Amino acid sequence: MIEYQTAVLDNGLRIIALQTASPVVYCGYQINAGAAHEQSNEEGIAHFCEHVTFKGTTRRTALDVINCLEEVGGDLNAFTTKTDTVYYSAILKEHLPRAISLLTDIVFHSVYPQKEIDKEVEVICDEIESYNDSPSELIYDEFENLIFHGHPLGHNILGASERVRKFTTKDALHFTQQHYRPDNAIFFAYGNVDFNILLQLLSQENGTNVTTVGELDKHLEKPLPVLSAYEPQTIKIDKHTHQAHVMIGNRAYAVHDKRRMALYLLNNILGGPGMSARLNLALRERRGLVYTVESTMVSYSSTGLWSIYFGCDTQDVDECMALVRAELDHFIEKPLTDSELTIAKQQIKGQIGIACDNRENLALDFGKGFLHYGWKKDITALYRNIDAITAEEIQAVAQELFVEEQLTKLIYE
């Protein structure tokens, strides 16, 4: 199990540190505020705030923010998801005080000057248009909007250019004052970090003291509005592109649903990253119909999403759809054999082990799990859960989620 330590400051900030011998420290603030926390009239504001948070604080100019870590070889980055916004750095251990000072400053003391916003809006809109020009990326957002139609989970993270151009300093302050609070965030650090020094630095920068050291008794997941009933649909959109893009899927399981692990394994068998994934073998290796075919799943606190994506020549859409249907029917009708199940478990455990060797991704994953769900990433326990999955559980998931009449389809032609 990965060694970690936790604490809470008087202002409610949660702290988690993972120990490793690496001289590089990955650290940052993970804030419980993403696209799903936006109001319907402010879609795109979370991502907008992520951009303009770098444009100056009460004691640093935008150029100061850029130079602070770069002049010692460090890296400063950020990203927005449906459920959170993350500001983080990669820095040599000796520069940790500098990183904590900068990260705390931009997260809690940014001023969002309108002059800087006016320039950055053009950058954001260029990002949006670039995304709109990439149907293989755009289709994921539009599909999620179909699955969660009318719900904040269906919000497009980037938003629309016409709305983003109207955002002001006042809008940024309104959103961040509501969500960018110490008691709505977690600070994570992964590296060769002295925990007592880490607490001292964070207490100093936050102007507060340590309340608790040890296990944290609750997570910070915010309840989202109740989902409306799911209604599968098929939508075709003429994109005037040479290649067709197709997504097929269904609502799936929430994070704490016991069926989620069976879907996790089934999804990897069906369309995971391996070339031996069933869909890759059927559509690409045997017939050469696609370059990319994959299946994905995501779980939120109260629901989830499972989907398949492929891109092919427009004249091959029907054949590819039939092949996908045949693979789904196979899982519905036949349980995995013992040898198939054993190989599938070995494969996914190997993938997990290799992924955990990426310290940056592990730090971000650990922070997210701890922020929303109170998870402590225990690889041994995860392997035990995988080993406990049965062929019958996998078949039951397929029989629930893969039924043709329950699938939503989005096709760009």
Regions found by a protein language model. Name each.
Residues G44-T57:
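Active-site SXXK
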Residues E3, V8, D64-H219, P225-V226, ...:
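Charge-rich, well-structured scaffold segments of protease-associated domains
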Residues I16, Y26-Q30, T53, N77-F79, ...:
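Short, conserved beta-strand segments within well-ordered enzyme catalytic domains
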Residues A33-E42:
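Short pre-active-site segment immediately N-terminal to the catalytic Zn-binding motif
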Residues M1-V25:
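N- or domain-start disorder-to-order transition segments that initiate the globular core
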Residues Q19-P23, G28-Q30, G214-S276:
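His/Glu-based metal-binding/catalytic segments typifying zinc-dependent metallopeptidases
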